[in-house]
From Swiss-Prot:
Its main location: cytoplasm. The gene is grpE. GO terms for molecular function: adenyl-nucleotide exchange factor activity; protein homodimerization activity; protein-folding chaperone binding; unfolded protein binding. This is Protein GrpE. SUPFAM superfamilies: Coiled-coil domain of nucleotide exchange factor GrpE (SSF58014), Head domain of nucleotide exchange factor GrpE (SSF51064). It comes from Streptococcus gordonii (strain Challis / ATCC 35105 / BCRC 15272 / CH1 / DL1 / V288). Keywords: Chaperone, Cytoplasm, Stress response. InterPro entries: GrpE, GrpE_coiled_coil, GrpE_head.
């Protein structure tokens, strides 16, 4: 029996070695996991920083685009308010019986208004030729004939205007149908 007490079983040796390697792994593992955690946190912070930086650039870009858009269309409301006055000037010029001086004065006012509008990018919409529903509003139709094909403009009731690529007011027209 004494012999058995001093002998170690091979199974016990394996168990002791396994316990020792597990203890070594545990002591080495916390260091490695702390390093891994620190690296993960650093990667996470870097990712958050990059996302925040990209978001800030997007905000700045959108603000810049909005500022440019506001600058481009800043005169839209003023133009819409002035267009009826321009229409009234055209009607006044169409009245017969005006003296030459009055007519010349009205034409000068009209020209200065049109020039000021052009400087702001406001242009009259051409209303001759073919009807385009993007720029013209048909308020009446008349029958087409040999001289006047369908979908062409017969008469302009009110001029249309656009500011760069925006329609301020479509031209009101009579269309051959």
């Amino acid at each position: 029996m004494a012999k058995h007490k001093h002998e170690e079983h091979p199974e016990d040796v394996e168990v002791k070695e396994t316990v020792e390697t597990a203890e070594q792994a545990e002591s080495a593992s916390p260091e490695k996991s702390e390093l891994e955690l620190a690296n993960e946190r650093a990667d996470d912070f870097e990712n958050k920083y990059l996302r925040a930086h990209a978001e800030m650039q997007n905000i700045q870009r959108r603000a810049n685009e909005e500022r440019q858009l506001l600058q481009r269309y800043r005169s839209q409301d003023l133009a819409k308010a002035i267009l009826p006055s321009l229409d009234n000037l055209e009607r006044a010029l169409a009245v017969e019986g005006l003296t030459d001086d009055v007519k010349k004065g009205l034409e000068m006012v009209q020209e200065s208004l049109v020039h000021a509008l052009k400087e702001e990018g406001i242009e009259e919409i051409p209303a001759d030729g073919e009807f385009d529903h993007n720029y013209h509003m048909a308020i009446q139709t008349v029958p087409a004939d040999d001289e006047h094909p369908a979908d062409t403009i017969a008469q302009v009731f009110q001029k249309g205007y656009k500011l760069h690529d925006r329609i301020l007011r479509p031209a009101m027209v009579v269309v051959y149908n």
